[in-house]
UniProtKB/Swiss-Prot annotation:
This is UDP-N-acetylmuramoylalanine--D-glutamate ligase. It comes from Vibrio vulnificus (strain CMCP6). Keywords: ATP-binding, Cell cycle, Cell division, Cell shape, Cell wall biogenesis/degradation, Cytoplasm, Ligase, Nucleotide-binding, Peptidoglycan synthesis. SUPFAM superfamilies: MurCD N-terminal domain (SSF51984), MurD-like peptide ligases, catalytic domain (SSF53623), MurD-like peptide ligases, peptide-binding domain (SSF53244). The gene is murD. Cell wall formation. Catalyzes the addition of glutamate to the nucleotide precursor UDP-N-acetylmuramoyl-L-alanine (UMA). It holds the Pfam family Mur_ligase_C. Pathway: Cell wall biogenesis; peptidoglycan biosynthesis. HAMAP family: MurD. GO terms for biological process: cell division; cell wall organization; peptidoglycan biosynthetic process; regulation of cell shape. The keyword ATP-binding applies. It is found in: Cytoplasm.
Amino acid sequence: MDRWQDIKQVVVVGLGITGLSVVRHLRKTQPQLQVKVIDTRPTPPGVEQLPPDIALHVGSWNDAWLAEADLVVTNPGIALATPQIQTVLARGVAVVGDIELFAWAADKPVIAITGSNGKSTVTDLTGVMANACGVKCAIGGNIGVPALDLLEQEVELYVLELSSFQLETTSSLHLVAAAFLNLSEDHMDRYQGMDDYRQAKLRIFQHAKHGVVNRDDRQTYPETSHGQQSLALVTFGSDDKEFGVISHQGESWLSYNQQPILASRELKLVGQHNVANVLVVLALLTCAGIDYRKGLSALKSYTGLTHRCQVVADNRGIKWVNDSKATNLASTQAALSGLNCAGKLYLLVGGDGKGADFSPLKPILAQLNLQLCCFGADGDQFMPLHASATRFERMEDVIEHISPQLQSGDMVMLSPACASFDQFSNFMARGDRFAELARQYA
């Protein structure tokens, strides 16, 4: 079936990295189409890279262009509930995202991962281990390279990280294996409630052959009403079932059906949440028919991703930890649960809170030798959580204030539990700035 048969005019909504990848893909694969780009920002990122013959409208919506479109490709950051998008849908015109276009074009097996936390680490490590097992693999989606740009690479397997936003506009993605890692409160400024958010995540199983779900979080299990009778479920968790954890030779081991795979202490990744992440990777590789035993040496040497519990400076016995990727409550909870700090923990929290409730942090913080440093637009929301809480405007102000107090055994950790958009372009920019400050003051 030729999906493009009746499509002549395409409007791409939102430029940036994703929008540019859509324009490049359409230009290369469907040169007959008339492509126009709308971005409501006055100077959108990537505007200088847009080919000069592509019509561009910035600073507002262009209702006339949307009214003429046969297909609208929207950025995942734009909610389907947006009135202009609703008007397009009411006309019976399809509104898709870049992942749906990828699904139309991909001709190799695809593994995809979603969840509130851990999906970037799982995606990256799945790709690293697949390559180590001799399967040429490309990694992207919501992490690093846009999905459509992966189609340029000669590979045998694609591994995609998918956000709930991306899944909302995806309906044709056939997966050899799909994982739903966990569900915790996030993006409540976008969704009507937790069930709304969960339903978006569950879309990952729509055309999946195997589904990897979390025994410790039943919310990750698909509902039978979804009509996915052909979906074969594989589970992971902290007990000894399927992909799990056993006691073997007096210590904790990762296991499959109670057979030992690897001692937990052999992992370079820190924290219990990362043991779960590794179990998911082993499950996904198994579902894709890849013998993970060939990649265990790569697993043992894997140190994780930048901005995720990453030690960026270690001087005079003081550790500086960049966990800028902790853009929600559960990420920060996970980081704190796996923590080993001999002295005082200086914890930097705050930013754009996305309407979340941070009170569940209070009992965790109460157990720590802590100085809570609250900054950014929603820093005030953290002030009632600990007696030590101090308010700052910017991250720089925090570091300047605490640096004279630091002693050997202390840890300075950025794990903000918030998005970065109040003061930074993204979580990477925030983490890079923290790393700069760490090197300066360490």
